[in-house]
Amino acid sequence: MAEPILSIEGVSFRYPNQSDYAVQNVSFTAERGEWLAIVGHNGSGKSTIARMLIGLLRPERGAIRLFGRLLNDATVWEVRRRVGLVFQNPDNQFVGATVEDDIAFALENNGIPRLEMVERIREAIRQVHMEPFLHYEPHRLSGGQKQRVAIAGILALRPDMIILDEATSMLDPRGREEVLETVRRLNRQQRITVLSITHDLEEAAKADRLIVMNKGEVMAEGTPEQIFRLGSKLERIGLDLPFAVKMGSRLREQGIPLRAGYFTTEELVEELWTLYSKK
């Protein structure tokens, strides 16, 4: 069996002058090409994990291995070249006057030759379907477009893993769907490993596997269908089940023969329409 691309082994961390651990004895793995979502309410420890993965925070106990190597001072810069982090606020990520300049910035810092740089920029912008906006100023873009440009900047560096740290939380529904569709396509077509840090279970439903965090510890782990069966347990820790999951459950209670496993409104409507058409 292939070695996991990410392995977190008994990791604990607490912030300075804090008695309670932000993350305590957390262990999990991620396979190459997997979309793994870490979900939890604010303060559950999920964003602390994201910062440890790129070396911004150092575990007090335990070990983090990425790409088969222990994450430490000697390996952190290599890891950062292979992992891209998309933050919550897209406006905090732009440094260039145009979309093209912004994508070029990280390439220049990594010493990529000019001709190769141009090729990578064109390829990355095509992958996120933003070709018409290459010479736009970032402030003229919508929130979803800005996050797609941020993803393009990461893709130009050709990473093995993308971390989305609440990357859709400030977007409207259309922008959120644009970003998630882009990520799903890259995950499926290029086998880029995706680690999604979110409190939004509708976003997490798109992942292959979920890890639920509560008070710094792993509360549950499984597929979206397995996790959503927890129902009220998730709601008690401040997580809101997707509308389609709640509505599907209520309809089944009323005797409507719906199958389980619907996570989006579109899927639920399609199933209801199919049932109606059979009458």
UniProtKB/Swiss-Prot annotation:
CDD domains: ABC_cobalt_CbiO_domain1 (cd03225)
Record localization: Cell membrane
GO cellular component: ATP-binding cassette (ABC) transporter complex
Topology with respect to the bilayer: Peripheral membrane protein
Molecular-function GO term, any one: ATPase-coupled transmembrane transporter activity
Protein residues bound to ATP: G40, H41, N42, G43, S44, G45, K46, S47
EC number: 7.-.-.-
Pfam families: ABC_tran
Record carries keyword Transport: yes
Main location: membrane
Keyword Membrane among record annotations: yes
Domain of life: Bacteria
Segments forming domain ABC transporter: 6-240
UniProt cross-references to SUPFAM superfamilies, sorted A to Z: P-loop containing nucleoside triphosphate hydrolases
Alphabetic keyword roster: ATP-binding, Cell membrane, Membrane, Nucleotide-binding, Translocase, Transport
NCBIfam families registered for this protein in UniProt: ECF_ATPase_1 (TIGR04520), PRK13635.1 (NF010156), PRK13648.1 (NF010167)
Subunit structure: Forms a stable energy-coupling factor (ECF) transporter complex composed of 2 membrane-embedded substrate-binding proteins (S component), 2 ATP-binding proteins (A component) and 2 transmembrane proteins (T component).
Family named by the database record: Belongs to the ABC transporter superfamily. Energy-coupling factor EcfA family.
Protein purpose: ATP-binding (A) component of a common energy-coupling factor (ECF) ABC-transporter complex. Unlike classic ABC transporters this ECF transporter provides the energy necessary to transport a number of different substrates.
The protein's name in its UniProt record: Energy-coupling factor transporter ATP-binding protein EcfA1
Organism in which the protein naturally occurs: Geobacillus kaustophilus (strain HTA426)
